Amino acid sequence: MYTDTRQWTLVINSGQATRIRLICFPQAGAAAEQLRVWSNSLADHIELVVINLPGHGPRRDEAPYDNWPSLLQNTFAALDPWLGEPHALFGHGLGALLAYETCKYAQERFPRQTRHLFVSGCRSPDSLPRRPLLHSLPIEAFREAILTLGASPLEMPRGQSDLQSYERLLRNGLKLFETWYDTSSGSLDIPLTAFYGSEDPLATAKHMLNWREFTGREFELIEVAGNHFFIKSQRQRLLQVINTHLGLLAEHRI
């Protein structure tokens, strides 16, 4: 299988020597460009690599994946060039599930290269999604539910055609998010940090706490103020934690 990786990643570094990469997976409906600002606050030794899935950003004309096997197969193929060197993984919402699956893949394919997994705003692999399932809601109920989670009306597309395209993309991502399930507890040998929003109904403390069952290494659960979109409002808090962990790794000569 051949995967053209040229548009899969947004890569930003400080120009200084890279000691570790932070590979990020945005939430459902979000393009890689939305995490570009992270590079301004990351330590100079960390190279930022953000995944851009089909249907998002510069790939908006491509059909998004609607099933997990194809999504994972092509994501892994695109990331192979980056996974063979020291890296950490971060994902929010749907992105956290992709980060977790990539972590399992990299642990087998590139042993000892994944140094940390950060999951954010995402239920543990063995937790069932809350009902009703968002991706199956009628259009008006779907729009209301997204706004209730904390999405800003100002950030929603204004034109009717663009709004409908965005909603299809978001609904597709939420379907992947809500139909995924995994019971392979203890499968990781990698430190894991889990972030959750104090007012996020999609990923409560109970949902997030069970992530501890999926690693045999250190586990850290961190509450941050905000709703499901705390990845924006609490960006500096997240990056403070990430910089601390990846800074300690650099001090120990990765």
Short names for language-model regions:
Residues 1-90, 97-254:
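Domain-scale detector for complete catalytic domains at protein termini or as standalone homologs
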